[in-house]
Amino acid sequence: MDNQAERESEAGVGLQRDEDDAPLCEDVELQDGDLSPEEKIFLREFPRLKEDLKGNIDKLRALADDIDKTHKKFTKANMVATSTAVISGVMSLLGLALAPATGGGSLLLSTAGQGLATAAGVTSIVSGTLERSKNKEAQARAEDILPTYDQEDREDEEEKADYVTAAGKIIYNLRNTLKYAKKNVRAFWKLRANPRLANATKRLLTTGQVSSRSRVQVQKAFAGTTLAMTKNARVLGGVMSAFSLGYDLATLSKEWKHLKEGARTKFAEELRAKALELERKLTELTQLYKSLQQKVRSRARGVGKDLTGTCETEAYWKELREHVWMWLWLCVCLCVCVYVQFT
């Protein structure tokens, strides 16, 4: 029984193979007539489109990561600059506070504070300018991946203006710092070289009780420094320095929090959102492509079955005609033989 079942199974498989291998009729063509021209074009072009979309998605995500990485570096640089500004603010406050007690110490602290403030400002300006330049390069790369609009000329002009403005600010700050430092250095050496002037300066800053002549000498010798400032001017300067110090501390705290959260930029998040949108679009197109492929295969199987049935019918009639002609020839031959025999 088992052998018989195996033979029947093999016979069935052989029959099915013969049906699959049977040639189709030459006068019948397989056509995907149910597909529109747009669907046919889509089936042909989708493999290339799929690779392009995958490449763009990968490029957008890599660009977003690169933007965040660059922003994190500049955030750290800004934190260093802000920390320097905080130290500068503290030194400036100490310079104002110590002016009545020690003129030389006040001058040194004020000079150092001004120098640190300038260094912090220059670092911040350079960092901001470079980051804007990097962001514009990233925007250009993003537009190469997903073209939107051309703003190259305008961006070039803006970039040149940014560099000119940054250079102007740096030169202005450096010039003022050097000028302030020279005044303080000259005042320091005058203070060391003239003890009487130093005593008059100390009395003026502590009690304010000095002669008019001494007051004029102090104002002339130390003009533009903390030693020539009145009490009200020192208080006002201290308030402004304290306000600036508080602002720098708040900025430092904000930058630290931003860095701890990953220091991600809005532009990078937009690129990631665009990549996710393209990924969803690719999934939808892939499903459509598979659906159309299934439709074509189903159509091909149905047409194949029809073609197989048509070919079997034609083969049957061809064989029947051959048998009829063969019997007709036999009958004719038999009739001729009988006729010859009896004549």
UniProtKB/Swiss-Prot annotation:
Pfam families: ApoL (PF05461). Residues 1-10 have a biased composition (Basic and acidic residues). Belongs to the apolipoprotein L family. The gene is APOL6. One of its GO terms (molecular function) is lipid binding. It is found in: Cytoplasm. Residues 1-24 are annotated as: Disordered. GO terms for biological process: lipid transport; lipoprotein metabolic process. Widely expressed; highly expressed in the uterus, fetal brain and spinal cord, also detected in heart, liver, lung, colon, spleen, thymus, prostate, placenta, adrenal gland, salivary and mammary gland. This is Apolipoprotein L6. Keywords: Cytoplasm, Lipid transport, Transport. One of its GO terms (cellular component) is extracellular region. InterPro entries: ApoL. The keyword Nuclease does not apply. The lineage of its organism: Eukaryota, Metazoa, Chordata, Craniata, Vertebrata. May affect the movement of lipids in the cytoplasm or allow the binding of lipids to organelles.
